[in-house]
Amino acid sequence: MDHYFPDVPGLGNVALSRHAQARMVEDGISEHDLKEALLNGSTTPDGQDVLWREKDGVRVVILRQPMPFKGAMLAKTVYRVRPAARATK
């Protein structure tokens, strides 16, 4: 499994944490699904230091400036997103 992704569009270098790798196994997320979300997903900022990349129900939570900073953003966790319930009339 790749744990380092150089030159991710719009982000630069991204490293995948051990926690994120473990969550992928727990949730049954394939490496292909991770790459699709990371490389082609929509980006949502969540405060100054965190952003998400999400595609096809897979969300990658990324720290922009992890400490200690080693020159890459850190994909802190990966998980499946379930659609929210919607009320119908």
What are these regions (language model features)?
Residues 1-89:
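Ribonuclease/tRNase effector modules and their secretory precursors
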